[in-house]
């Protein structure tokens, strides 16, 4: 395992990952975060350098980490299952309860196999596809039929966001607070200043947790918020993406109409201790 630290190496890797889109989109987003300010203390490792076949961008809790309250997350890009297996069994990767993996669906079995060998089981959430917008020219804004104001979330809104997630708990509260505190987000507020629609971004530059309260739907709020965030990200020279479940026909239609194209199937894996 080689951990890339030098700016020239990370910049070179960025150019290589661009050539591997759409398969590399999440790792590329994490690399962009590292090159910007790396608030989330991400690391980038590869199987070899200056050429590589597998790259893992990850946040690993260590002594002195500012984000110990957030589950460790690993985003994987690989063109070779043998090199992927080698990286995942490297001693520098500390397998423990709560690890999260984001990986192309056809690589998920390797993660499950190694987790089992290490005495863990894996909870799987699959069936997601990346939807990517590569340039401002391909960005189509949906019509907004509301006069409500646009604003940004603050940490006091974290519980409101988590209430609308299909999963929750203290881990998600901490994660959402960190996203709101450190990363771009947008929301629409009602006449009293309360958020009624919002979109967040994560450390891999993925649009996440989009939600609109029922009485405010069908007014173009989420589309408008996504458009604003996408413009910002693309202006930074980065393709913008989100992950949508294959059964979410409404979101797929919305993103397709906005100029996003479908990428690869993604599976999320959560490592759990046995027993």
Task: Enumerate the predicted regions with their spans.
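Short amphipathic alpha-helix that is part of the acyltransferase structural core
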Residues: 1-27, 128, 134-172
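Acyl-donor-binding surface of acyltransferase catalytic domains
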Residues: 41-42, 48-148, 269-271
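Conserved beta-hairpin
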Residues: 41-58, 181-197
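Conserved acetyl-CoA-binding loop-helix of GNAT-fold acetyltransferases
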Residues: 81-90, 218-234, 252-257
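Conserved active-site alpha-helix within GNAT-family acetyltransferase domains
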Residues: 107-121, 246-264
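A conserved beta-strand-loop-helix scaffold within acyl/acetyltransferase catalytic domains
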Residues: 168-215
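Conserved hydrophobic beta-strand within the GNAT/NAT acetyltransferase core sheet
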Residues: 207, 240-244
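C-terminal helix/juxtamembrane-tail motif
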Residues: 264-275
